[in-house]
């Protein structure tokens, strides 16, 4: 939680306010909560959107209820992040983010079921319009520098000499 708050505080020190912050897994769930509950009334922060990616719903980052007090979040936050009498950082991310992604379209569907949702399926179903699956890795057909129509000079591993032309 400290890292999440520090990351948001750092934005002001750098005078850098991104359009989107991409949060990965339960460790970054607090950033979404801090942004909405504490920072959102401050103009530069109010425009920042969050994308929360979950790779595996089994890992939920569950802590004692007193964690909320230590984090400095408002008391009403409890109703949004309570999970079986504990605070769930995963739930913080899912509830407070603007968009949710996961590792595939199939997994995005599966985690909305009781079999794979690990207790979060209700939240995910209620936010299904903001949930998508994106396959890990690169699409080598769509992103092939030997055939890509959007680059100036085509190249491949056997002939990388034209790669530099695309950086001019």
Which residues does each predicted region cover?
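Catalytic cores of nucleotide-sugar-dependent glycosyltransferases that transfer UDP/GDP/TDP-activated
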Residues: 1-168
């Amino acid at each position: 939680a400290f890292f999440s708050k520090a990351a948001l505080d750092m934005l002001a020190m750098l005078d850098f306010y991104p359009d989107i912050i991409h949060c990965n897994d339960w460790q970054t769930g607090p950033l979404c909560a801090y942004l909405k509950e504490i920072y959102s009334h401050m103009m530069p922060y109010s425009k920042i959107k969050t994308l929360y990616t979950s790779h595996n719903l089994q890992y939920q980052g569950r802590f004692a209820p007193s964690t909320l007090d230590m984090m400095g979040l408002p008391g009403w936050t409890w109703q949004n992040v309570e999970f079986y009498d504990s605070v769930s950082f995963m739930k913080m991310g899912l509830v407070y983010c603007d968009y949710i992604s996961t590792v595939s379209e199939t997994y995005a569907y599966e985690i909305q079921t009781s079999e794979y949702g690990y207790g979060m399926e209700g939240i995910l179903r209620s936010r299904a319009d903001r949930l998508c699956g994106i396959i890990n890795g690169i699409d080598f057909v769509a992103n092939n520098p030997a055939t890509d129509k959007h680059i100036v000079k085509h190249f491949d591993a056997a002939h990388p000499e034209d790669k530099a032309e695309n950086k001019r």
